[in-house]
């Protein structure tokens, strides 16, 4: 099982250079999403297709009444605006919250709460859409331009593919470090010197990062039989806590044994805490209650819980006005990389890692010139 619900975006520029999606045997989700609407105790599923990629279903889904024609037109205009120009321009200009941005685009509360909140709340791992609009614009563009895919062997195949180029003999894991210096690491009571040290993590604090609950189920069959993500459109006005559900094995059959299905539910940490669900048992029961209302209690009762994962530092905080760069702090400081140095995404992590490697090469070759690596702000 992946640690959390992970997908790759094929539109990520730097990731596409560093990762061969074909060699990982990636398979895509279908563009768009399904949404579940619970009314008077009865669940209804509706499809929100992408009219740019699936024009016929896009037109049909525009007539299902889930969103108004006015909202759909405004979403279309927003898509056209965000997908134009250079990617770097997405990180310039206004830096308010995602909610502020959507409201400036004159989207209705219904569209925001029913569609954008469960989708992007589940991506950003926060339930108020307080993430910087710059990151929203970037992720929205990536989703519009590319596909969400699952590698055959899970998300771990991404670092493993990079490790192959380095050579497993050159990688040592599982060593507890007691002290970090620019050219030395202290572990097992001794100082070990190196040509250079790169710190690829942030030191967590009580207020650092966002947390998420991911619950994986083993089901005898898929409850959706669809290669879409299912969004909870009632998240804002009910006691439910699940942001979205996916059946990864519908997309990538290798994720479950033959004749079984893997069902994965995502619960944003601050939503669970707000609703008073902070233990594994209470979160699992709340998730089963949600899914039982959508798919039927009889169906969900046959599912076996495979894992209840509480990931405490799943993403760095990228609130509006929080400007992070991808450069080492100054002078001879230890080089630091990771998504916390840029923005919380696979692209942010890989782009930061590449830039740190360029800086490391510069130092090792005694090059005094400034590295002109990519610098982005959030």
Question: Where is each model-derived feature located?
Answer:
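Mobile amphipathic helical/loop "lid" adjacent to a hydrophobic cofactor/ligand pocket
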Residues: 12-21, 25-129
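Conserved beta-strand segments of alpha/beta enzyme cores
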Residues: 25-27, 169-172, 302-304, 333-335
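Conserved donor sugar-nucleotide recognition element shared by glycan-biosynthetic enzymes
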Residues: 132, 155, 346-349
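Helical element adjacent to the flavin cofactor pocket in flavoenzyme catalytic cores
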Residues: 135-184, 192, 196
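Mid-domain catalytic core of redox enzymes
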Residues: 175-281, 293-294, 375-378
